[in-house]
């Protein structure tokens, strides 16, 4: 194994060389550890979120089928009848299933008086678990009989619920528990690692809904899952389901026309809109590694220049060129190996920091760890870095002229023109890359500032929200829910410390929506498939005052209108402008295609509210008197602290009904802040990478000029001895350094104008070519570059001529 003996020999010699210059070795190892560690941490995040397969059977063949209505609804589920037709007529799926994640709109109350707790739940077909390849860890799954209307009242529980509320009782299977006041039998417990839909506590069979889903073609609750056959493709599935949808549109034009099908990998539903963000961050951290590599290359080149005489002697004694290159690469490999070992430690810390910074805004970040794939990436990155960093010093080792280097008068450390050009080019490159990163960070900062200045349409200060869930069995009618709410709000509004108490079925910026079609009386009547959609919210009479939503025209609801459930409506400005441009909306009457018997009169227009995101346009929205849902959001504006307000809610709810749980306590200011978590995450990481790049670039410029000054000490001393003023020496070195800085800034500006367009999707109200951002970072980098040039230049102007000449 001669190659191993040679490598061992080179490694021993390389270690001795590295130990002989501990400062340079330490700087190189730390620089590479920073670059490789940051890349490993970000790649680990990308792998966890984007590349890691879903924990389901044949995850790469699982797809999600959704619907959209052009111009009205971007993405929603399907009526159960439509799902059943697609499931029966398709030829591309091995198996299909449907689920309805009900948690967003309704609560499921577990337990009884004094121990009630609201649970998140989903209604699923009996094939739901089999298509995912999941089986209960205890008990059984749903059967076909459970799917029949009026089937047995049974449920499956999550492992977390089984431990939390049932105490991990092995005898719990087969026992009956109260869900929404009605008895349900627990038939199984799912494995601890099963979380779909996310955070679900309970799964119910579709039969518990009764017969209404089999008679309804307008409610879009059910999301369809399909497992593609091995020979089927996504495009083929899309085409086939398009054909089935066209048949449904012809058969049921009033309900199924104007609806389109979208087929996507199930992974896309988990990933959401973070794909672009993570790849941009990966590109940014890749730039950091390149900058780190340029610094290390420059350091190793300086070391190679200083060792020219050593390499010349070895060449003169018969060492082959490839042996010299191998020696240089081996030393580089040892440096990179040390950097990689430290990088894995930094990556572990960095990944934990990334998870903490994401604050729940990035999906699939549960149990973050460095997987085998991440270790493989680190090894590959280390090998690539070795080649990238080691080639230039290795080539320089065999490129030096042996006879010239061995001459008595030859100055050790005098670099060739090609080496000097390469080192200058590397500095220009890192200045350019640093400008790119700083530009991206500045754009994100400007975008985040714009986002923070957005008016959400309400006043979040001193607002606290809590949810309550009324059991369906105890409050089956709208009138009962409205009566409970009316009495609760009356009590809360008379509680000390509470200025205003109100209620709504959905809160702004909560991610919850409830769209529906609307027809205007006096205009052509459109069916549910073609009627324009608006967001609908049920609210109490003083909701607008409590939230601080301004009334623009007309009036808001009275207590009597809410209590009696009168058909009146308040709309936002967006709906008024969209439906009645240039006209008065007050007094207009609207009706839903789903309930043509309920005609509502518009009595007021209020300001727009950001319902889904601060950077999204407010949708047309219609408010109605509250009373439809069993889940209520209480909104309390008070002068006291939030804990006192929440305590008051607990007391008043318990006084009315101890079986009603109180949960999800939030401050509206926190809700607004949380809506910006993803943008804050992107900004902090990008800014951090930019600061690291700025530091490395400054060190790179300083290191190059320090090397130049050290190499030209004799020349500088001679100039001063012959009468050159120290200021001239300062100008000479500063000019040499600033030429590189300015050239790097120029190439960086051009690169930024071209590459920053890739960030357009991440920016809000800021152009990717924003001149203010680009100008600010250019000036900043020029100042930092000038400071980095000044320190070695000042050292040059203080060179003692006699000392310099004696040293030579």
Label each region the model flagged.
Residues 1-24, 56-57, 72, 115, ...:
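Membrane-helix entry/capping segments
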Residues 34-61, 68, 350-359, 433-462, ...:
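Alpha-helical transmembrane segments
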Residues 47, 54-104, 220-225, 451, ...:
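Membrane-proximal extracellular/periplasmic loop immediately following the first transmembrane helix
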Residues 292-336, 699-741, 745, 795, ...:
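Interfacial "coupling" helices/loops that link adjacent transmembrane helices in transporter permeases
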């Amino acid at each position: 194994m001669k190659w191993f003996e040679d490598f061992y020999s080179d490694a021993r010699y390389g270690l001795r060389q590295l130990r002989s210059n501990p400062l340079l070795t330490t700087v190189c190892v730390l620089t590479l550890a920073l670059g490789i560690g940051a890349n490993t941490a970000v790649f680990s995040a990308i792998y966890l979120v984007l590349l890691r397969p879903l924990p389901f059977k044949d995850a790469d063949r699982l797809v999600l089928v959704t619907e959209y209505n052009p111009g009205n609804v971007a993405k929603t589920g399907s009526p159960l009848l439509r799902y059943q037709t697609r499931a029966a007529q398709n030829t591309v799926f091995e198996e299909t299933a449907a689920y309805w994640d009900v948690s967003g709109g309704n609560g499921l109350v577990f337990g009884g008086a004094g121990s009630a707790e609201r649970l998140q739940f989903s209604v699923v077909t009996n094939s739901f678990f089999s298509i995912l390849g999941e089986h209960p860890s205890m008990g059984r799954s749903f059967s076909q009989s459970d799917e029949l209307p009026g089937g047995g009242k049974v449920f499956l529980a999550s492992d977390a619920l089984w431990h939390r509320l049932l105490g991990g009782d092995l005898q719990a299977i087969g026992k009956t528990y109260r869900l929404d006041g009605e008895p349900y039998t627990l038939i199984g417990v799912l494995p601890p690692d099963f979380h779909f839909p996310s955070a679900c506590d309970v799964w119910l069979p579709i039969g518990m809904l009764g017969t209404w889903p089999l008679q309804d073609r307008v409610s879009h609750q059910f999301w369809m899952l399909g497992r593609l056959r091995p020979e089927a493709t996504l495009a083929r599935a899309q085409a086939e389901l398009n054909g089935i949808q066209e048949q449904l549109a012809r058969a049921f034009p009033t309900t199924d026309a104007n609806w389109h099908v979208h087929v996507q990998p199930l992974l896309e539903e988990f990933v959401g809109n973070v794909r672009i963000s993570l790849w941009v961050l990966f590109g940014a951290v890749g730039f950091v590694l390149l900058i780190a590599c340029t610094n290390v290359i420059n350091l190793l080149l300086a070391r190679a220049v200083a060792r020219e005489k050593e390499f010349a002697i070895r060449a003169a004694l018969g060492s082959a060129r490839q042996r010299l290159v191998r020696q240089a690469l081996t030393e580089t490999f040892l440096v990179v190996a040390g950097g990689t070992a430290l990088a894995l430690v930094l990556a572990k810390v960095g990944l934990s920091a990334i998870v903490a910074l994401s604050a729940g805004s990035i999906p699939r970040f549960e149990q973050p760890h460095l997987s085998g794939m991440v270790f493989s990436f680190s090894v590959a990155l280390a090998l690539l870095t070795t080649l990238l960093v080691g080639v230039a010093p290795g080539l320089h080792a065999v490129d030096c002229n042996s006879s010239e280097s061995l001459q008595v008068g030859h100055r050790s450390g005098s670099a060739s023109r090609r080496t000097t050009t390469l080192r200058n080019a590397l500095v220009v490159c890192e200045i350019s890359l640093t400008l790119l990163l700083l530009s991206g960070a500045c754009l994100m900062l400007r975008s985040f500032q714009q986002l923070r200045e957005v008016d959400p349409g309400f006043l979040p200060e001193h607002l606290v929200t809590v949810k309550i869930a009324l059991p369906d069995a105890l409050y089956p009618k709208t009138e009962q829910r409205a009566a409970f709410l009316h009495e609760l709000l009356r009590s809360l509004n008379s509680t000390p410390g509470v200025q205003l108490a109100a209620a709504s079925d959905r809160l702004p910026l909560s991610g919850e929506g409830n769209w529906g079609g609307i027809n205007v009386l006096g205009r052509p009547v459109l069916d549910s498939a073609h009627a324009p959609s608006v967001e609908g919210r049920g609210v109490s009479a003083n909701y607008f005052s409590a939230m601080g939503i301004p009334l623009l025209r007309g009036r808001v609801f009275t207590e009597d209108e809410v209590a009696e459930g009168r058909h009146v409506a308040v709309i936002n400005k967006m709906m008024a402008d969209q439906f009645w441009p240039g006209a008065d909306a007050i007094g207009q009457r609207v009706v839903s295609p789903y309930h043509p018997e309920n005609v509502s009169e518009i009595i007021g227009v209020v300001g727009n509210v950001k319902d889904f995101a601060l950077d999204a346009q407010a949708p047309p929205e219609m408010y109605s008197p509250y009373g439809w849902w069993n889940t209520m959001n209480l909104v309390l504006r008070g002068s006291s602290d939030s804990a006192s307000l929440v305590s008051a809610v607990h007391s008043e709810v318990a006084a009315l009904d101890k079986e009603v749980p109180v949960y999800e306590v939030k401050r509206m200011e926190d809700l607004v802040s949380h809506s910006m978590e993803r943008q804050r995450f992107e900004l902090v990481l990008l800014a951090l990478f930019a600061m690291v790049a700025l530091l490395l670039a400054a060190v790179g410029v300083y290191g190059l000029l320090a090397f130049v000054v050290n190499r030209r000490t004799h020349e500088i001393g001679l100039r001063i001895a012959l009468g050159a003023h120290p200021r001239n020496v300062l100008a000479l070195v500063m000019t040499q350094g600033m030429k590189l800085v300015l050239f790097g800034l120029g190439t960086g500006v051009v690169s930024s104008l071209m590459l920053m367009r890739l960030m357009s999707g991440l920016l809000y109200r800021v152009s990717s070519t924003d001149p203010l951002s680009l100008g600010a970072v250019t000036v900043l980098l020029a100042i930092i570059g000038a400071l980095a040039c000044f320190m070695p230049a000042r050292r040059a102007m203080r060179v003692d001529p006699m000392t310099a000449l004696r040293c030579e």
